[in-house]
Design a protein with these regions (language model features):
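Cell-wall polysaccharide-cleaving catalytic domain and substrate-binding groove, primarily
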Residues: 1-143
């Protein structure tokens, strides 16, 4: 039996995210959130990502089970919580001041590959030394 995949509007989820109480705690810019959302896409029904992990909303994996559907509001709340979690972990492994665009790209990268892999990466080692062009060049190695 074929299941129906229910997608959601990235724009609607981002608008709802801006209304979440913890939104003001984010260091990622609205453009950075849009980057994450555009790259991840949005689905209200759970699906298995390319790594075989159950996922819903905008790249949310914690506690996702094969059955059950979420709302766009839940997707927005999960996005804000997930990005805050990524930011918290990056503050430990890459505690350097960086341009906003570099920060947004780092958060997006870490959101996708996981903070463990990101923090062990050559990309982060370049960021720690504030070598932005070399850090940027590392992104291609992960595609």
């Amino acid at each position: 039996m074929k299941s129906i995949v229910k997608k959601c509007s990235v724009a609607a989820v981002l608008a709802l995210a801006a209304l979440m109480p913890d939104f003001r705690l984010l260091n990622t810019s609205p453009g950075g959130l849009a980057l994450i959302a555009d790259l991840e896409g949005c689905r209200l029904t759970p699906y298995q990502c390319s790594a075989g992990v159950w996922t819903s909303g905008i790249g949310h994996t914690a506690g996702v089970v094969p059955k059950g559907e979420i709302t766009e509001r839940q997707a927005a709340a999960n996005l804000v919580a997930d990005v805050l979690n990524v930011e918290k972990r990056l503050a430990v492994c890459a505690p350097v001041k960086m341009p906003q665009q570099v920060y947004d790209a780092l958060v997006s990268f870490s959101f996708n590959v996981g903070t463990g892999a990101a923090c062990r990466s050559t990309l982060v080692s370049f960021i720690k030394r504030q070598r932005w062009p070399q850090a940027c060049d590392q992104l291609i190695r992960w595609v």
